[in-house]
Amino acid sequence: MGRTLAEKVWDDHVVRRAEGEPDLLFIDLHLLHEVTSPQAFDGLRQAGRPVRRLDLTIATEDHNTPTLDIDKPIADPVSRAQLETLRKNCAEFGVRLHSLGDVEQGVVHVVGPQLGLTQPGTTVVCGDSHTSTHGAFGALAFGIGTSQVEHVLATQTLPLARPKTMAITVDGELPDGVTAKDLILAIIARIGTGGGQGYILEYRGSAIEKLSMEARMTICNMSIEAGARAGMIAPDETTFAYLKGRAHAPEGEEWDAAVAYWKTLKSDEDAEFDAEVVIAAAALSPFVTWGTNPGQGAPLSASVPDPASYEDASERFAAEKALEYMGLTAGQPLRDIKVDTVFVGSCTNGRIEDLRAAAAIVEGRKVADGVRMLIVPGSARVGLQAVSEGLDVVFKEAGAEWRHAGCSMCLGMNPDQLAPGERSASTSNRNFEGRQGKGGRTHLVSPQVAAATAVLGHLASPADLADENAARTPAGV
């Protein structure tokens, strides 16, 4: 019987297999940041152990970093302590670190791919749930806890139970204005935030194959929001073109050998998945969340659902609580929801294609009165590229704030936060209660919807801008 993509990569990394025990996997790339690594380094220090494979370990500062005045001392004592601790630990153990101000600093899941460290057929771990991002390359990538971070630092291996596999097939053409973010939000709404629990998801089909690498990273990034262990997409010519010439990509004969191996990394025709989901791309439209988990979403053209419409009692209760927290009423058109803040950034949508898409919409327009728009590149390198293209000027002229790279408003661990009761349209990945600041209300959207929302002041798509322009044009003009 054939094997799935996930099974092939998993099997290639088994160091030890014994009946009744988890498989022991070799880890090819270990990514670190300041939040989940301090206790792991403490464990090494207490045991007198070194980092086993410094060549496979890299750290960056992202969660706590400010996005303004990065040349000044960090004001928040907790953030400052975590960053200083990471610097101390990396210096003591010899771990490569990209600190604030370094050209390669940024959100860890943006930095890995842009350096060419993330490659097909590898195993990638990080003490961060959105490590699934790297699965876009055909890598087996998943988030781990702090004790597991220590285990990998000490042994470069990890004992893991083998997950099941789920195929999510998306065929057809995505309609104009529908993005990878809309697609993954629709998938999560379809299968639920627990639908992928215990599975590695493989995204496949003609619609997936047509996506750019950055769009594929958006898809795999939010696999965890569906409850999955990881998400993967088989590597292809798009993958190879993205990697070729990057700092850590193979070269010459090694490149040829790598590509030959990478081409074998696809599910066999007779491979059997434990579950399958089929999505028609043509039926999709811009998507937004209305509630307090990523599965509580709907097409932008819809209205806030009535909790009474849910047959399942737990879903009905969750919807009631979500509407109460979000300050919404059943039947309210999603397009009528006004926002205070728009955030474009994060490891989900902070790459150069995302910034280009948002800039194309706000160019020649102004951010609505009373709305704050934050543009935060996913890495310093992305920021430099955006500046070279003049995107920073486009955003500033529209009235948006141009910031330095970092996790920023994705989570309330740095100065970029919502005030209680404030509402955001955010290109990040989680809309939990208080995720962007205590009492903050978050709607997850694509960069295109975020930009249109910033201009109109309420949840909107780029098509709404065209409709408004048409409505303002005098007859006969």
Curated annotation (Swiss-Prot):
UniProt xrefs under InterPro entries: 3-IsopropMal_deHydase_lsu, Acnase/IPM_dHydase_lsu_aba_1/3, Acoase/IPM_deHydtase_lsu_aba, Aconitase_4Fe-4S_BS, Aconitase_4Fe-4S_dom, IPM_dehydratase_rel_enz, IPMI_cat
Binding site for [4Fe-4S] cluster: 347, 407, 410
Enzyme superclass (EC): lyase
Pathway: Amino-acid biosynthesis; L-leucine biosynthesis; L-leucine from 3-methyl-2-oxobutanoate: step 2/4
UniProt xrefs under SUPFAM superfamilies: Aconitase iron-sulfur domain (SSF53732)
Residue ranges, annotated region (Disordered): 418-442
EC identifiers of the protein: 4.2.1.33
One Pfam entry name: Aconitase
Reactions the enzyme catalyzes: (2R,3S)-3-isopropylmalate = (2S)-2-isopropylmalate
Superkingdom assignment: Bacteria
Cofactor info, note text: Binds 1 [4Fe-4S] cluster per subunit.
Gene Ontology MF terms in the entry: 3-isopropylmalate dehydratase activity; 4 iron, 4 sulfur cluster binding; metal ion binding
Keyword entries, A-Z: 4Fe-4S, Amino-acid biosynthesis, Branched-chain amino acid biosynthesis, Iron, Iron-sulfur, Leucine biosynthesis, Lyase, Metal-binding
Cofactor(s) needed by this chain: [4Fe-4S] cluster
GO biological process entries: L-leucine biosynthetic process
Purpose of the protein: Catalyzes the isomerization between 2-isopropylmalate and 3-isopropylmalate, via the formation of 2-isopropylmaleate.
Quaternary structure (record): Heterodimer of LeuC and LeuD.
Family statement: Belongs to the aconitase/IPM isomerase family. LeuC type 1 subfamily.
Designated name of the protein: 3-isopropylmalate dehydratase large subunit
